[in-house]
Each structure stands twice: as C-alpha cells, then as structure tokens.
Amino acid sequence: QGFLRAFSEPRAARLQRVSLREFDFSDADLDALCNQALVELDLTHCEQLTARSLRSLRRCRRSLTALALLGCPGVFCEPRGGAGDSATTGDADSAGAAGRDASLACFERLRFVSLGALPRGVDVCGALGSLPALGALHLSSTELPEDPSFLLRWSATLRSLGLHNCGATPAYLRAVCLLGELRHLDISRDKAVGQQCVPLTRGALCGLLQGLPHLEALDLSGNSFAEGCTVGPDEEAPCAGSTDPSDSSIVAFRCRAQPLQFLGLFGTTLGTARNIPAHVVTGEESEAHVLNAIEAYTDLRPEVASTAINCLFVLARVSRCQQPLRALQLVVSALRRHRYNRHVQVTGSAALFYLTGSEYRAEHPETLRRQVLSVVLNGMEAYQEVTVQRNCCLTLCNFGVPEELEFAYGRATRLLLAILQQPTQDSVQRIAVHLCNALVCQVDHAHKEAVGRMGFVRTMMKIIRYRLLRKTCDQVMEFSWSALWNITDETPDNCKIFLMLNGMPLFLECLHEFPRKQELHRNMLGLLGNVAEVKSLRPFLMTTQFVTVFSELLESDADGIEVSYNACGMLAHMLHDGEGAWGDVRPPRHLVAQRMWSAIARWDASSRRNINYRSFEPILRLIPQSVSPVSQHWATWALYNLITVYPDKYCPLLISENGPQLLLGMLGSHTTHADTKEKARWV
C-alpha cells in the first residue's frame, strides 16, 4: 500500500521499464508512478485498476512504447459511482463503457499493446484508437467487432497479432490474410472456454499461409480442423520427422518455401502428423512437443500450461525423460510463476516427484535442486488440500533430508508440522511424519531445540494419542516415537517437554496396548534412554512402576538386543546416581543390578545395531566411577560392540572424545569388574 508513491519523483529514482504484473495496488499508486517518463509498462492482471488509471497514463503518452493491460477489465469501463480511487470494479461487466478518455488514441508512440478479458460493451476499435506506430497487438478472450476491417489500419506496420480465445471468424481470417507484414499470428483457443468455433478448413489455412509470406510463428492450438487438412496415406512423404514444407503432412504448408520457426498445435488433431514443417512445435504426443508447450504457454496461459504439465507427468511416469533437465527447469518455472494457481500446483507438484527421482539426480545442479525445494515449500504453504500436500511431501522424499533442506530448515519444519496439526489422510500423515523424523535426525542441538519450540514434541504426542485411541499401531505410530527419540537426543529441553506432556503414562499405555510391537518398543526405549541421560530428569523415572517395567524389559529379545540394551542403558544411568537417589524404589537396586549383569551376558557382542550415535559423551560419563560397576560394564560393552561392528565410523569418534584415556584410567580401578576390564583392553 503506497509503495509505488516512493517513485513519484523522477529526480530521486528514474524508471523506464516497469512490470507490476498481478500486483494489487490502487489507481492513486499508479498515478504517482506516472510522473516518470515510462517506456514499457506491464499491468497484466492488475484487476483493481479503473479508468482513472488510464487517464493517469496519458501523462506518459509521449514516452510509452509498450503497454500490457491484459486482465484489467475496469480500465476501459467507468465504474458506477465515478472514477474516484475508492471505486471498485467488481461489477465492471454491467458498468457503462467509459467515454473518449477510455482510449489509447493519444498514445501515438505505442508499438506494443496487450489487452484482454474486456467487459461486454467495450468498443475495441474505440479503445485502441489509431496507434500509427503499432507493431504488435495482442487481444485475448475479448468480444471482437463483427467487422474486422479495423485491423487493416495497421496493415503496413503490424508484425505480431494475437487473437487468442477471440473466436476468429472466417471474416477475420480473410482480413488477417491482408496483413502482409505479419511475422507472428496467434488464433489459438482454450477448449475449456467452451465457445463455439468453426473448424478451420484446408482453404482457410492455405489462405493464411499464402497471404502471409513473412510468417515465422503460427499458433493454432485448441482449434478443430475440417477433413482434408492432412495428406492421405498415399501422399505421405517416405521420411518421418522432416521439417521440409514439401514433405509436410499438413497440406496447406506445402506452399511455403521455408519451415516456420514456431507452430502451435497443442490440443489439436494435427499434433500427431508425421511431418510438421516447423522447428518448434507444441503438442501432446511427444516429450519435445509437450516441453515446447509448457515453455510457450506458462507465462500468460496457466491453464494450458497445466494441461501440458499433466501430459509431461503421464510421460515421465511410464518412461525415462529424454530432456530431464529442461523438463525440471520448465516445471519449476511454472510453479514459481503461478504460485497461487491450483491447477498448476497440482500438476506441477505431481510431475516434480517423477522428475526428481534418483535416476536423474546426477543431472541436477545444486542451484536447481534448491529451486525445486523452494517451489515445493511454496506449494505446501499456499495449499492445504490433500493432493498438493501429498505430491509435495513425496517430492521431498527424493531429496537428502535434512542436509538439502538446511537453507530452509525452519520453514520446512513449520510446514510439515502444520500438515500434521490438521486432519488429513493417513497416507499424507505417514509421509509427513517420516519427513519430520528425518529432519531431526543428524542435526545439531540448536536445530533440535528450535524445532522443539515449534511444538514438535506436542504434535508427535498428539498423533500417538490418536493412534492409541484407535488401538492402531502402524508406521505413523512407530515413526512418531522414532521422531521423539531423535529430537530428544542430547537435548534436555525436549526431554523435559516430553515429561511435562505426560509422556511416561503415554509410554506405559502403548507398551500395554501393543506388547508384541518390537519396532515400537525399540523406539520408545530409545527415547526414554535420552531422558535417563539427563540427571535433573531422572527423578521422574525413579518410581517403582517405571523401574519395574524397565527391569522386566531387560529380558526382552525384541528387535535383537535393542530393547534390552536400551532398558539396560536407562537403568545404568539411574544406578549411577547412587543408593540415595534410588531410595525405597522396588525392585531393590542390587536386584536390578544383578538382572543387568545377566542381560549383558546374554547379548551377542557382534550384533549389528539399529542405532546411530553422534557422540559417546553419555556413555563415557559412566566409565570413570565406582558407584555402579554394572553401569560401567554396560558402557564398556556398548563401546566394544560399536567399534567391533562399525570400526570405521566409531573408532574416530571414540578417539576424538578422549575415550581411550578414560578406559585406561578405569583399568587401574579395584572396583571395576574383570569382564569389564577385558572388554576395555580390547577397545
């Protein structure tokens, strides 16, 4: 609001070329900008503007050479109530046409004009005026006068004519044939518009191509064609894919000496022709034609571009793309250009999933992959509907999370949590929880703490409670506990949030309701192991109820040794606090210690692990002590197992955290068990 008024003084900031496409601003704002000697001005789809803006633009009539007013219905129509800044254009269709002021007649230097979607009753001829220098006229979705002769006033100057969705009649086609200087002609239409259209005949096409000898680009997309426009099987040239006009499968083009630079055939039966005499062709059949269509129509025809992107989606789903880099760039461009167009977002996000698959990854530069992620997040932000959310989440799964999302980590997390906080399909929720889990895995404490403050823990626990209420233990339930395990890793604040939100009763309920779900048990015990590592939080675990459960889980063989290992780790930290902290909790401390010794003795030291340590600090703190020998033994066994099975990964980590020195110091302790010393020497 009012931003453009900052540019009202040319001496402070000189502007010549300005694009305000799809901006929402007032007549008064544009009036301030008209103090500039503007040369080019794009006001496409600035729907709030009225006839007052056109009067303001008259101050630029001596400098303005290009003006785009496509999708500005009120500019040529005086709204009821006058042309004041407070007037609206909501009922522009029923408003009376403006008088002589609503005309471009005084803009004698204009060479490019784009109009479209004009209200009924607007006199197109009067709105345009004479415009003696006009070289390009683009009309779109506008009711044309019955008499096309007004076009002939520019027969000597017009190089480009666009009549998209104008329903060009045979009379107009005959008039166009008299515009001998035309290089570009667009008589395409959108099938979705539903307007009656007379099929183009072989004679009409021949008339255009013979009457326009300089024609370089012709768009016929969306039109229907009468019989006889293509050659019969006997007349077909023996070659295929030729651009030579003499080989053309479309009869009318055989009269040309040179192929066209561009030919639009999207949504037509001619797109399947064997030989098309043009270097760039839009169509639906081949990948190249589809990509050309996306490129040609993205800017001003989002609905057509959406249809073309859907064609690309179908092709990419069943076969490998031949131009994957170009395809991805075009889809990203369309999604960025039409962030709030639902059709583009739905088809574009679906296509992205296939275009970012692993088979194409090596061809994608880092900058492009980041652009893909940005448009995916834009789609998630703009649309809450299931289709877009699912497509966007699936596409994110094709990327390295969290590393490739580092540049937008906070935003991505907020958007995923927003999806999970709203009712949605289980399939979308499953993917979103999986991504949330990946986001908090292998990131530093600062990231985890920030995510915790966003409500991550609360959201996961809400999902778990809902699944528990339905007595359902599925991937969503397991992923949610896994996410809680990851976000609480060495992050005391998040551990505390879990406890404050009644996490321990939730753990017991899940354990009771799903006694045979091994993956669930492993994830829950991993989380509680993180809680047990926080000294200030261990008193919350030091109850008879919890200690009884933990000690019973020492006997579990669920998921190999994982559940028993995690339960033992929790108890190791609790025993490390000493007799005083244990108090009168049952079972007694010495009995729990015996069970821990027995459990550790049963474990296979060569077991492969479903666990990932970023630091050994919580384990190493149990080494230099004599309060709990079994805690010391568990820590030593853990190190022994990890560096035996994964030496390349964990030996450097142990050395970097001073582990060997701590183990050497332990060897001289008379309270250390012999088995513990044996493991320590090997380590």
Say what each PLM segment does.
Residues 7-10, 30-37, 54-61, 78-108, ...:
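A structural signal for leucine-rich repeat
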Residues 180, 200, 233-236, 281-289, ...:
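Alpha-helical scaffold repeats of the Armadillo/HEAT/TPR superfamily
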Residues 30-31, 54, 78-80, 126-127, ...:
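Flexible loop/turn segments at the boundaries of HEAT repeats in alpha-solenoid HEAT proteins
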Residues 1-45, 64-65, 90-92, 110-115:
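LRR N-terminal entry segment and analogous cap-like coil->beta motifs
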Residues 65, 105-111, 129-135, 149-159, ...:
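Alpha-helical solenoid repeats of the armadillo/HEAT superfamily
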Residues 1-24, 174, 191, 216, ...:
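Cullin-RING E3 adaptor/co-adaptor recruitment helices
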Residues 50, 75-77, 145-146, 169-170, ...:
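Eukaryotic short linear interaction motifs
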Residues 19-25, 42-48, 68-74, 90-93, ...:
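Concave beta-strand-loop units of leucine-rich repeat
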